[in-house]
Amino acid sequence: MVYRYLVKAYGVSLNKKVIYGQVSNCASAVTKPQTPKITSVKKDGTTKAAIQLKTERNVKGYQLYEYMWQTKKFKLVGKIEGKKYYKYDSKKKKFTRDRKSKVVQNAKKKTISVKITTNNVNFKRYRRYRFKVRSYVKYNGKQIFSKFSKQKIVTR
């Protein structure tokens, strides 16, 4: 949420007239978006996961992270903007549109669902896959991120 402020000083003269000063320059402040919530993560086939999360108001998009067992860290795997999903290429350090993954918005339940392909190459049958998400807004060309959601686990 963006807040803009203007300040104008005033005072009362001896003859009880109100005297106003000049208006200040516009000052603005941005609040971080709310922490998103992953409502469910389900397996979908052998290498896909269906992720559903609650939508937030005034949010530009969401970034999805997956836990990598090889590095023991969460890795950015993609982002959702509107009804589009973008995969993240860590070598090129940029997002590319993934036309295979469909984003479904449910206005009644206030949720977004997306099916993504997992990036873990060492796929094992009973391995757990962990996901977390954060939302962001854009302000003056910069992205302002929320806190990360609690991680959700799906067992393959």
Predicted regions and their residues:
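Residue-level signal for short segments within beta-strands and strand-turn junctions
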Residues: 9-11, 31, 47, 66-70, ...
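Recognizes extended acidic, P/S/T-rich segments that occur
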Residues: 1, 63-124
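Short, surface-exposed beta-strand/loop patches at domain edges
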Residues: 111-113, 135-136, 150-151, 156
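Beta-strand-rich modules
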Residues: 1-16, 120-141
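Exposed beta-strand and adjacent loop surfaces of beta-rich binding modules
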Residues: 48, 59-63, 128
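Pro/Thr/Ser/Gly-rich low-complexity, intrinsically disordered linker/stalk tracts
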Residues: 16-58, 142-156
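An aromatic-rich alpha-helical recognition segment common to small helix-rich domains
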Residues: 5-9, 36, 51-53, 64, ...
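Small side chains
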Residues: 9-11, 29, 49, 61, ...
